């Protein structure tokens, strides 16, 4: 599916499909973290079952100012995280919204186009 963002001065998800996500037209086939402040970094996890607290604790440091919200894309289906994995983010009063990865792509684009401080952690399972 192709997506179009209203705000062009930030990274945005421009398309996605099974096993890939395109950010600003560039296709990615591995999990990634995308911040509305412009950062795009690989995320070192390939399976939901392998996620650790360390995967989430690094998300707050991507932006100069802490994000308001982390949108977590859990893969092809919605799966909720154990609260212990989110301890670091919750301790910093950063909200976490969990959804499947395609919904997370759409939600990230909407929030980023509104100028919100948002980070998307998008799991692409291999």
Where are these regions (language model features)?
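Non-catalytic interface/targeting segments
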Residues: 1-54, 113-126
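Short glycine-/small-residue-rich flexible loop motifs, especially phosphate/cofactor-binding loops
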Residues: 18, 83-86, 108
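Short active-site-adjacent helix-start/loop capping segments
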Residues: 42-43, 78-81, 107
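Short, charged beta->alpha transition segments
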Residues: 53-61, 107
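Mid-chain, well-packed structural core segment of small domains
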Residues: 59-98
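General beta-strand structural signal in soluble alpha/beta enzymes
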Residues: 97-100, 120
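Short acidic loop-to-helix transition motifs that present clustered carboxylates
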Residues: 101-106
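Conserved phosphate-binding catalytic cores of ATP/NTP-utilizing and phosphoryl-transfer enzymes
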Residues: 107-113
